[in-house]
Amino acid sequence: MVHSSMGAPEIRMSKPLEAEKQGLDSPSEHTDTERNGPDTNHQNPQNKTSPFSVSPTGPSTKIKAEDPSGDSAPAGPPPPQAVQAHLSQVQLMLTGRQLAGDIQQILQLQQLVLVPGHHLQPPAQFLLPQAQQSQPGLLPTPNLFQLPQQTQGALLTSQPRAGLPTQAVTRPTLSDPHLSHPQPPKCLEPPSHPEEASDLEELEQFARTFKQRRIKLGFTQGDVGLAMGKLYGNDFSQTTISRFEALNLSFKNMCKLKPLLEKWLNDAETMSVDSSLPSPNQLSRPSLGFDGLPGRRRKKRTSIETNVRFALEKSFLANQKPTSEEILLIAEQLHMEKEVIRVWFCNRRQKEKRINPCSAAPMLPSPGKPASYSPHLVTPQGGAGTLPLSQASSSLSTTVTTLSSAVGTLHPSRTAGGGAAGGGAAPPLNSIPSVTPPPPATTNSTNPSPQGSHSAIGLSGLNPSTGPGLWNPAPYQP
């Protein structure tokens, strides 16, 4: 290859040598050939790299760049040695620029056409050392080659990150340290799962323990939230405490709320060791009732021993509703609080009403029976109509109920004691007098008729008059 490359400039320069054959010597021709040698040696590697260059304009630009040097040689008289050295340097600069342009075209084609982007990297790296070896004496020329090399490295490293992230991850041949950077955070998550699971178990256990101890101390969820707000400055609602006990809060909020509740629980148990000491929420504020007014804290459920319960049962059988002094006496005898004894009697009376509703009712007259027609009718003397007697359970007096303007129904009345005057009789309704029991068969009107015989009713005035001939009892005829 060296001989062929050396022959090319000899043929090219033979035309000007034949034109000025007499003025040139053979040493000068040999010197010109040697000076053009590096240029030809530098062009041959470019011709070798032409298969990698997709653009067909590369060789044409080389020929155009070589033509001015070829035309300028035969134009003037025989140039001196300094002029030839300058021309060879200019040719080297032009070839260096051509190489830089070809490298940039290759890089652009790698970005736009070739997807992998790493198959053309070895030829480009192989091309640059040859260009540097062919020019050992020139300083500006290596700078031209280093600049494309740096840009090539930058483009090759940035191309997989920007345009092809999926191919860069799947291809094991690429050795880019930036491609494996997003993967380590995924590996950090699994070690945190055992710790999170243990924390969840601990939170669940604490929530159950907190609820049991809170109920044992007699605090409500609202009391806990308000007490924490007054004591520690973190006010929580009843819903928040309820969701914490039910494990319905987020993991972050559960972890944030746990130390506060644990601190409050320890303080509450410490303060409630002695029953005389107030609870933590009472130290900070008066507890609120349902209507928002100051009230009292819910008391603990009182457990009554068996022997005390038997004594209370005996007292209840003797007197179901003792007075305040009797309750105080019973409390002193049983060494109990007066309020506890009073509440027990109230609850016991309610229980007795549920068990025996009839025995607990007061002794009152039985309610009235439904109306039933008498088998006999009483016909007044004036013939105004028939008035059957009815039986009512009110008291000594009986009333007359009129079903119509002329006919009324009355049932016989059972009275505890009846007089002749019919004491306590109701006022007349539409000039209808009260009803009194009749005498048995005589004119004596002081005793009621125990046989339930027919009564005599006077319609003329308030006081009835009983006498023979006023009433004619007649049997009921349907």
From Swiss-Prot:
Biased region (Polar residues) positions are: 38-60, 275-285
All residue ranges annotated as the POU-specific domain in the record:
195-269
Entry's SUPFAM superfamilies?
Homeodomain-like, lambda repressor-like DNA-binding domains
As for subcellular location, the record says: Nucleus
Where this protein primarily resides, as one coarse class?
A: nucleus
Return the GO cellular component terms, semicolon-separated: nucleus
Basic and acidic residues: compositionally biased ranges: 12-37
> In which residue ranges does the UniProt entry place its DNA-binding region annotation?
297-356
**Which terms under GO biological process does the entry name?**
cellular response to virus; positive regulation of interleukin-6 production; positive regulation of transcription by RNA polymerase II; regulation of transcription by RNA polymerase II
Region entry Disordered, spans: 1-82, 167-199, 275-298, 357-391, 409-478
Composition bias type Gly residues, residue spans: 416-425
Q: Which family does it belong to?
A: Belongs to the POU transcription factor family. Class-2 subfamily.
Protein name as catalogued: POU domain, class 2, transcription factor 2
Q: What's the source species for this entry?
A: Sus scrofa
